[in-house]
Amino acid sequence: MATHKIGVIVDSFRVGVKEGIKKAQEVGAEGIQIYAVRGEMDPDNLSPSDRKELLNYIKDHGLVVSAICGDLGGHGFAIREDNKAKIEKSKRIMDLAKDLETNVVTTHIGVIPEDSNHERYKILQEACEELGEYADQVGAYFAIETGPETAVTLKNFLDSLSSSGVRVNYDPANLVMVTGDDPIQGVYTLKDYIVHTHAKDGVMVKKGDPEFIYACFAEGLPENFRLDDYFLEKPLGEGDVDFEAWIKALKDIGYKGFLTIEREVGEDPEKDIREAVEFLKKII
């Protein structure tokens, strides 16, 4: 019997939420993750009855919600003046997650510096302390996605927090593509914190500065700069993530949650996602 369940991010289909839910069922997924930051999934746009209707629609398609994506973009929580509004929005996203019967909200918080005396480190700590405390209150996890920093730097940051509500959404491809960190060893490093994962693959083309790369996501690309010169996302099994070793590591640490497929590029996402589901089913 498979240890893990397979999920998909419905937004990866690029067809809207309800159509994405249908497609998730069609490709054989057991769960879904949904972006909930704007548009039809913005918590401000979903009444209690809307939430019940959506949850019933998900259940009617034989699915559960593995997590909600609450990534608010920009520099995450790295700019203190922006954080009051972002923290309140993130709390509302956690409320929505609970209404949709999941306890995980995933996000990027910004690039955590290695130096704990860095001013940004303290700003991120303050935001995560408040969000972690709220997560504890409502029975949720606010899960930082791996990528901009090494697993060791992320672990040290998490260890510095007083709340147990801040955890990890483990994306092995982000580590491969941006920091060059070992995605297998990272599982063991972050073993006490992983509550959700993204099944994604990729390659690093050449080493770049993670600070600069994530600033490009936040602010847009400079002229004549191409992210493809630094890294490429690939279909599962075609990049540098050793998925059999990754899944073994997850089993070793006792993780029994979702492997949620994320496909952010490609001309035929439905085909790629369907093949990714089949790929994972063969190795779990």
Label each region the model flagged.
Residues M1-T102, D136, S163, D192, ...:
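N-terminal pre-domain/capping segments
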Residues I6, I68, E126-D240, V277:
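Acidic/histidine-rich catalytic cores of soluble enzymes
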Residues F13-R14, T260-K271:
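A short, acidic, flexible beta-alpha connecting loop/helix-capping segment that sits on the rim
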Residues G16-G20, Y57-V64, G76-Y170, M177:
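Active-site acidic/histidine proton-transfer and metal-coordination neighborhood
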Residues G31, V104, H196, G257-F258:
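Residues at the N-termini of beta-strands
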Residues I34, T107, I144, Y170, ...:
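Conserved beta-strand positions
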Residues N45-E53, E81-K89, D115-E126, E149, ...:
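Alpha-helix N-cap and loop-to-helix initiation/capping positions
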Residues E238-D252:
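A short, acidic, amphipathic alpha-helical segment used as a generic capping/interface helix at domain edges
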